[in-house]
Amino acid sequence: MRMELKMMGNVNKSNKTNEYILRRHKKKRKKKLIIFSILLISILVTLCFKHPFFNVKIVEVKDNKSIKKESIIKSSQISNENNIFYLNLNNVKNNIMSNPYILDAQIKRKLPNKIVIHIKERVALYYIEKDKKFYIIDNNGYVLEKKDNIKNMKLVRVDGIKKKDYNVGEPIFEQGNIRKNFMKNLASLIDKKDNNYEIAIVNIENMNNIQLKYRNIQIIIGDDEDLDKKLNKAFSILLQKEEIRGAKEGYINVSFKGNPVVFIK
């Protein structure tokens, strides 16, 4: 009787061991199946993404004003051989930003085969003349290009900057420079007016004696404090009095508080 019970115990123990082994084998097979499935899906997805269906067919440029769409697309170096998923958007942005007239570029994918480029442009407002060349400057003192002729470009000449070289794609001032801050402030005021208030020249050699030129009239600003109020005073006089606007020579001094001093010949 004891022998039979012992044998039955061994059988039960053996059955339990076999069940445990079977469960382990099942788990291993299941794990292998999951890994294989993931690998297969990954391969299929990769092959799918590399399919020509996802090659770039359309490049759309938005918010460009003065720069031609074709020029932006060319500088982006995007071709119809580029896969939309494998296209390096940072490289595309850097390529586009090599154009000095572009302040910023945002590139987005639009499935299945479209790239959208949003452009923010720099605006040409000033110029500096040196060695019979014209350096086009934006409101932040950034050199946009060098030209031999600026005919039909409504720009304000900047005098009084002493610098040996001007390099396209680089700023003419260091960050925080008082002249840079003034040019940016002036730009925000005159850019809102037709023809830039018709200001032809701004002289910033002496930042305590800033002067503007309107036709034949010199506008003496003094320092850059209360610039908007000083400009309003000067141009209120100019717009109200034809004899001043048409004078052969003269000046309006708004560098101090109180009524401006006006002199014409």
Swiss-Prot record:
Membrane topology type: Single-pass type II membrane protein
Subcellular location: Cell membrane
Extracellular side: 55-265
Side of membrane Cytoplasmic, spans: 1-33
Transmembrane stretches, start-end: 34-54
Assigned protein family: Belongs to the FtsQ/DivIB family. DivIB subfamily.
Descriptive protein name: Cell division protein DivIB
Gene assigned in the entry: divIB
